[in-house]
Amino acid sequence: MKNFFYIYLSILLLFFVNCSNQNSKPKKLTIQILDTNVTDNSFNRLVEILNERFYQLEIEDIKIQRTSSNTFQIESAELLNKDDDIIRIILKRGFVEFKLIPEKEYVINVMNKVDSVLRNWIASNYEENFEDESSLDVYQQMELTDKDFSREHPFFSIALLDPQFRVADAFVREQDRDSLERFLRLSEIQNIIPEEIQFTFSAISQVDNEGNKFEMMYVVNKHSELSGDIIIDATASIDPSSEAPVINFTLNSYAADQWSNITAENIHKRIAILIDGLVYIAPVVRTRIPSGRCQIEGAENIDDARAIATILKSGTLPHSLTVIKDE
């Protein structure tokens, strides 16, 4: 009986050891570099920045191995315990831009033209064969509460403006974003959008009281007032007044001088801070900011805020990346 007990105990221990070994199996990500011209120098710089980001977030035992001219693998057991959103943020290129937002009257005028052209496009193509059938399918499938309004104002039926017109930012339901982007890509629409501006979206989704997700759509200047590796320090913390996560960052001396002049010349105007083309915050400039210190709000939690602060501090990756395999 005693021998049977020891045999049973040995089998049980072996089972737990095997489970432990399986659990410690490293997570492996295969990454594609979205550029055709990847030099050894640019790849080495990419690895250096990624290692710095992992180090700052206390993710250890990272192995990065190049597998082809434009692919590489990242391997670590610690990645198993990290949220996918954190990994996504770490792999962001991290290109920072400061862009002015045009006056709301100008933006609404542009939107009115887009709405009018889109209405005519739908009317002329609704019962005919046309090249971009996917866009029409989207229109037919949209879930709109007021069909009459959607026919007269197809743009404003999915780009919802503030009824009081305090700003010209538009609320876009998560399920409508693809439709809106597809409409904005139509050549008829592109031809009437002024060259000096662009439509873009918020980096972080919001949720209303009913649990519906939506994003903000902004119109910003194409020209950047500041851009590139201009940040020397960034930290994440909880704001004591709002109890929400914030990212505080400091510009380098050159950018701080430029920022001081930019804010002095644009009192009462809005400036958007973008990372990789998406807006994180678009505050009104109340006064000149001579210190070179800025703050970003809106991160979903403190872990996301730390990850964003890390990519700001580590600098811009020389190439954009995408995950093509996760195992």
Q: How does the language model describe each region?
A:
Residues 70-72, 289-292:
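Surface-exposed aromatic
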Residues 20-22:
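Bacterial signal peptide processing site
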Residues 15-18:
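C-terminal motif of bacterial Sec signal peptides marking the signal peptidase cleavage site
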Residues 2-10:
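Sec-dependent signal peptide recognition
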Residues 58, 283, 290-326:
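Extended, hydrophilic extramembrane loops/domains of integral membrane proteins
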Residues 32-284:
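Non-transmembrane, solvent-exposed regions of membrane trafficking/translocation machinery
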Residues 11, 26-36:
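Hydrophobic regular secondary-structure detector
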